Amino acid sequence: MNIIELFGPLQEIIFFILEIGVILGSLGVVLLSNIVYSAFFLGLVFFCISLLYFALNADFVAAAQILIYVGAVNVLIVFAVMLINKPESLKIFPVWTVGDKITLAICLTSFFLLVNIILNTSWSNITVITESKGFLESNFTQNVQRIGSLLLTQYLLPFELLSIVLLVALIGAIVIARRENLIETNKKKVLQIKKSPTTF
């Protein structure tokens, strides 16, 4: 049984709330200058997308979304950005530059084009195929087994390489953060030496 069917007439409201969560979370990711806040909003986006997968009866994809993106990737991002976050970046909203305005114009144009496409699509011509519960359960089991088999046989090397790339990215962020902290510490020491009175 589809999870969203349990709520009956509230399904449109639930979809609307999840879509608003995705949109607001995405805006928080790109508009906030504090990287830690952006990472938390990114986690909100991942979580709302996983709930959308649950609503569409894609249980395995939703569970993978929560475990991989929310539980692993977003946690790593939060730890990494906490290491490289500078203490002087206390402003919530950044100062707008010419590049930011151009990027905003491009994003708004793309957004309105997508909205126009969605509104002009004849959704009434799309037919919904109803499937039995037994078929869904067997199909779900076969899909999970097939995905696991492909990841451990045919796509084993790309899967391991992707894990190594994520590990290298995290280590690189830590190295850059330590280097920036060392540079800032040396600058502060030099300024303190210059400001302190010379005693003989």
Curated annotation (Swiss-Prot):
Keywords: Chloroplast, Membrane, NAD, NADP, Plastid, Plastoquinone, Quinone, Thylakoid, Translocase, Transmembrane, Transmembrane helix, Transport. The keyword Transcription regulation does not apply. It is found in: Plastid, Chloroplast thylakoid membrane. GO terms for cellular component: chloroplast thylakoid membrane. It comes from the Eukaryota. Its EC number is 7.1.1.-. Gene3D superfamilies: NADH-ubiquinone/plastoquinone oxidoreductase chain 6, subunit NuoJ (1.20.120.1200). It catalyses: a plastoquinone + NADH + (n+1) H(+)(in) = a plastoquinol + NAD(+) + n H(+)(out); a plastoquinone + NADPH + (n+1) H(+)(in) = a plastoquinol + NADP(+) + n H(+)(out). Belongs to the complex I subunit 6 family. NDH shuttles electrons from NAD(P)H:plastoquinone, via FMN and iron-sulfur (Fe-S) centers, to quinones in the photosynthetic chain and possibly in a chloroplast respiratory chain. The immediate electron acceptor for the enzyme in this species is believed to be plastoquinone. Couples the redox reaction to proton translocation, and thus conserves the redox energy in a proton gradient. NDH is composed of at least 16 different subunits, 5 of which are encoded in the nucleus. This is NAD(P)H-quinone oxidoreductase subunit 6, chloroplastic. It comes from Physcomitrium patens. The gene is ndhG.
